[in-house]
Design a protein with these regions (language model features):
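N-terminal entrance/gating region of PLP-dependent enzymes' catalytic architecture
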Residues: 1-110
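Conserved beta-loop-alpha segment that forms the PLP phosphate-binding cup at the N-terminus of a helix
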Residues: 93-101, 112-136, 148-152
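Active-site nucleophile and cofactor-binding loops and adjacent substrate-binding regions
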Residues: 88-92, 114-121, 141-143, 191
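PLP-dependent aminotransferase-like
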Residues: 135-183
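Active-site pre-lysine segment of PLP-dependent enzymes
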Residues: 174-175, 200-212, 224-249
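Active-site C-terminal subdomain of aminotransferase-like
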Residues: 236-310
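Active-site phosphate-binding strand-loop segment of PLP-dependent enzymes
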Residues: 171-219
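Short acidic, glycine/serine/threonine-rich loops at helix termini
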Residues: 126-129, 150-155, 198-202, 227-233, ...
């Protein structure tokens, strides 16, 4: 029932990784008998979870990661890289840049800026923070949008307002235009797959409104982002996903339909110049090369390099 063959592959990969380090022998003091007791207790306690890993469970996002993602994450934990700076994880930082570039390409972004996060909540907060620095004004989102947007606006002290949804649960573009006429909207958050109904906001209509009123568009695709790859969407929905190349920022959660271990979110920006907003200096934070250290473009400091490896 639980896939276990990958454990053998992990042992082999560990030996290969160890062979790459030319270090003097170092013995670790580990009480394996006690460790076995603890793991047995953990195994029993973990039985008090719903078995979402079984195919009988459908229609929810708490799926186990892909076997290779899970095993790669475990392998990385023997190093435990920190992708804040290259010194903490040179190769895992390189992998993160590759992953982010792949996701940006999936949405049609050319030049881009982005990084992985602990999840969609942190990624959305960062996107809203950048939006507030670039374009002053309140942030609006559909009344079907995830509650995190209103909450993060409260944290960031940014005015927030809900836009009425239509009968299908999508943002009502006519109601949005009434708000835009006031001239005090800085950013419109669209949802690509609402949590309750899985609906996609009318990006085509919202882009037309942007040409008229000038505002930022942030796409919350934490849940629905990977449907960009789906081949069975209706043409109108498919068009909305293709139009994502025109938004200012996108959030996607690889730990949902990307089959990655929790927590792994990602924030992407269409304009790399927003990197200047992250500039900071302190006597205990410095970077040892001209190559980009991901901590230079992230609100989070320590971040698990294992997420990028997976």
């Amino acid at each position: 029932m639980l896939e276990k063959e990958s454990v053998k592959l992990l042992s082999k990969s560990l030996a290969s990784m160890e062979a790459g380090f030319d270090l003097p022998h170092s013995a670790q003091s580990i009480e394996y008998a006690r460790m076995a007791e603890v793991l047995e207790e953990v195994a029993k306690r973990m039985q008090n979870n719903y078995p979402y890993f079984h195919p009988l469970f459908a229609g929810q996002m708490i799926k186990p990661p892909h076997p290779i993602a899970r095993t790669a994450y475990q392998l990385a934990m023997w190093i435990n890289p920190n992708n804040h700076a290259l010194d903490g994880g040179r190769e895992s930082s390189k992998m993160e840049k590759e992953v982010v570039a792949d996701l940006a390409r999936m949405f049609g972004f050319g030049q881009h800026l982005g990084h992985l996060t602990g999840g969609g909540t942190m990624a959305n907060m960062e996107a809203l923070w950048v939006a507030s620095q670039v374009r002053r004004g309140k942030i609006v989102a559909s009344d079907q949008a995830h509650y995190t947007h209103q909450r993060m606006c409260e944290v960031l002290k940014i005015p927030f307002e809900k836009v009425k949804g239509d009968r299908a649960g999508r943002m009502d573009a006519r109601a949005l235009e009434q708000m835009l006429k006031t001239g005090d909207v800085g950013t419109v958050v669209i949802t690509m797959g609402t949590t309750g109904l899985g609906m996609v906001d009318p990006l085509d209509e919202i882009l037309a409104l942007r040409r008229k009123y000038d505002f930022r568009i942030h796409a919350d695709a934490a849940y629905g982002g990977y449907f960009r790859l789906a081949k069975n969407l209706d043409p109108h929905t498919q068009e909305k996903y293709e139009l994502l190349r025109n938004v200012d920022s996108i959030v996607i959660d690889p730990h949902k339909h990307g089959l990655q271990p929790y927590g792994c979110g990602c924030v992407l920006f269409n304009d790399p110049s927003v990197a200047t907003l992250y500039l900071h200096d302190s006597p205990y934070t410095y970077y040892t090369s001209d190559e980009l250290h991901l901590g230079e473009i992230s609100l989070e400091c320590s971040r698990a390099g294992a997420s990028a490896v997976a």
